């Protein structure tokens, strides 16, 4: 059976692993998942990630905790296969008054909402993180 929304699956795996206190989570890999993991690492929401290539490519994300609680409080999918969400450079959302981030897929790559505003590009809003 094929997976309908691999990004939603990735976000759900991260949420579930953090709820039970796991140190890392493994999932099937793709270019978009690696890009999202890279943004999460750069912004400090996860400790790091490791991608293996080959016939069965896997992505392992090392989760991050602060005083025993997950660093990621909310991880929500915005654009989904049934209802894509696009925003221009002036319409990009701010998450929790700028405390969180929105991950955006643009023509210049996957980046945060702040980086997209600075680059002057809009795109598909993949998810929000707080």
From Swiss-Prot:
Cited InterPro entries: Ribosomal_uS8 (IPR000630), Ribosomal_uS8_CS (IPR047863), Ribosomal_uS8_sf (IPR035987)
Pfam families attached to this UniProt entry: Ribosomal_S8
GO BP term, example: translation
One cellular component term from this protein's GO annotations in UniProt: ribonucleoprotein complex
Domain of life: Bacteria
A molecular function GO annotation: structural constituent of ribosome
TM spans (from-to): none
Native organism: Teredinibacter turnerae (strain ATCC 39867 / T7901)
Record's keyword annotation contains rRNA-binding: yes
Family matches, as PANTHER family: 40S RIBOSOMAL PROTEIN S15A
Keywords recorded for this protein, A-Z: Ribonucleoprotein, Ribosomal protein, RNA-binding, rRNA-binding
SUPFAM superfamilies xrefs: Ribosomal protein S8
Similarity comment: family membership: Belongs to the universal ribosomal protein uS8 family.
HAMAP family in the record: Ribosomal_uS8_B (MF_01302_B)
Function: One of the primary rRNA binding proteins, it binds directly to 16S rRNA central domain where it helps coordinate assembly of the platform of the 30S subunit.
Name recorded for this polypeptide: Small ribosomal subunit protein uS8
Complexes and interactors: Part of the 30S ribosomal subunit. Contacts proteins S5 and S12.
């Amino acid at each position: 059976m094929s997976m309908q929304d691999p990004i939603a699956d990735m976000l759900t795996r991260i949420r579930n692993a953090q709820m039970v206190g796991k140190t890392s989570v493994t999932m099937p890999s793709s270019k978009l998942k690696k890009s999202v993991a890279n943004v999460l690492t750069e912004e400090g929401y996860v400790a790091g990630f490791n991608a293996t290539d080959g016939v069965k490519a896997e992505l392992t994300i090392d989760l991050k905790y602060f005083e025993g609680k997950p660093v990621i409080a909310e991880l929500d999918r915005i654009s989904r296969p049934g209802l894509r969400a696009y925003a221009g450079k002036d319409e990009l959302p701010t998450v929790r008054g700028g405390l969180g981030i929105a991950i955006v897929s643009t023509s210049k790559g996957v980046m945060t909402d702040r980086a997209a505003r600075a680059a002057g590009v809009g795109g598909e809003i993949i998810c929000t993180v707080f």
